[in-house]
Amino acid sequence: MSKIAKILAREIIDSRGNPTVEVEAHLEGGFIGLAAAPSGASTGSREALELRDGNPARFLGKGVLKAVEAVNGSIAQALLGKDAKDQQHIDQLMIDLDGTENKSHFGANAILAVSLAVAKAGAASKGMPLYEHIAELHGTPGQFSMPLPMMNIINGGEHADNNIDIQEFMIQPVGAKSFKEAVRMGSEVFHHLAKVLKSKNLSTAVGDEGGYAPNLESNAAALETMKEAVEKAGYVLGKDITFAMDCAASEFYNKETNRYELKGEGKTFTSEEFTHFLENLTQKYPIISIEDGLDESDWEGFKYQTQVLGDKIQLVGDDLFVTNTQILKEGIQKKIANSILIKFNQIGSLTETLAAIKMAQEAGYTAIISHRSGETEDATIADLAVGTSAGQIKTGSMSRSDRVAKYNQLIRIEEALGERALFNGLKEVKGQS
């Protein structure tokens, strides 16, 4: 009933108009799983490799026909007749077949899409929702929690065509009593932010992740604008709503000068100076989480940043750790950061993703489930967040259906879980419980 009968891949389009890989996994019992791989814009140098065709005559070189061919050929052949419920075996087969350190032979986009499609088919064969199947794979059967959303309402950096250097300015509806209420609060602030921007004759065009992308005089001006929107929505800043930022500092780090260059403000900083720049912002605004506050290779700088800020706020490693247990283990040993961002496609399989979440949780680090800037309607990360009780999720703003699909799936899951739907809000954030 749960043996794989057919694997079928195709090229589809993501939210940035680029091709990505979608896979159907068909089981003997008639069960089907459908999944698509996301794609990032600001990527860590140690991420698993996304396989692109490189043919400039087609999709500007970004086609994924090679990855599709790998799935429909070698991968499909290897998986036929295998049990879809044995996720670890399926993923290991693909990793071994690929044979490279960074999945560059088949592409992480190919392997991940198969991995997720098989997981969905496996869940269907067990007659259970995906989040329940994931909880079992994670070794925590029957344990679920709803994540606190980190909503990216002002986009900058690589996610927008504006002059803001910091990539994401987020709100967290920590005063909510349920996930559905958190979504409502976020939506209301989002709409009030549009009014605030319009009143200042600023753009309300949106970036890759559905947040507004105005030109502002400084990064602090983004926080000030958000503060105004929160207050106009009738919420108390710091009590009902808190702030979070993703600096994506590797994107404005000059490796030749070892300086962080905020070109939008005309300022440059050393590692220590940039840490204190961020510290100053946390003293002015209720920022309780900062992601990639320094360059991914600046481990000495991160050590200092963790010493300065790590007891007060959540310091999240994204490009720093790239969902990789080997790198995370080193970070834990060296006391660098206190949280990891979890992105399926940075590592390239569900099994390896679950291993990174487990390692973080066992070390007392938080694990934040995240989308990528290039997304599809696939909402698997919603089930991942609930099934691993990760406690936090980043899936963009309150616009663009590729973002909203994840919020809507979480609303459905919360409804299905009923009284079992725990929502811990602020307690899920490192340093805030």
Swiss-Prot record:
Entry EC no(s): 4.2.1.11
Keywords per UniProt: Cytoplasm, Glycolysis, Lyase, Magnesium, Metal-binding, Secreted
Annotated (2R)-2-phosphoglycerate binding sites: 167, 343, 372-373, 394
Protein location: Cytoplasm; Secreted; Cell surface
Quaternary structure note: Component of the RNA degradosome, a multiprotein complex involved in RNA processing and mRNA degradation.
Any one GO CC term of the record: cell surface
A Pfam family: Enolase_C
Organism domain of life: Bacteria
Keyword Methyltransferase: no
Cofactor requirement: Mg(2+)
Species for this entry: Hamiltonella defensa subsp. Acyrthosiphon pisum (strain 5AT)
Enzyme class of the recorded protein, top EC level: lyase
Protein name: Enolase
